[in-house]
């Protein structure tokens, strides 16, 4: 019995289909999944197949992933460590019509005691590349703002100092229009 590693588009009734693929890439079976049935072991196996086995957790306490240290469990918590893993994880969630929440560093993120239903995708260390080329700084969504400011300073660039004290990530800062200390 192999993992379920492929997904096909959901039909209009909000059902998704996971396809079971054996070790020789032959389709074995289709598993129908409804939007409320995402605790299925086959789905966890599918997500592990695209994001990495160690990167998929069930009932993960969100308090471990927020700067306020509060929050109940995420039904499924995924931390893809490559861009390809992220794209494949999002594709699987969309194709199976799963509830999806994307988080960064968890700064200013308030999660209730009941947690987050569905799949939480966290952009972290594997998606935090920072490159400096002359006067241009390029940073991935999971890069911490403090690390971006430090990389700019190390390259002799100025202007990023105000973000060094913000505990967020680039993706979260862009999405939420973060700012503090004149940033």
PLM region descriptions:
Residues 29, 33-84, 117:
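N-terminal flexible segment immediately upstream of the FAD-binding catalytic core
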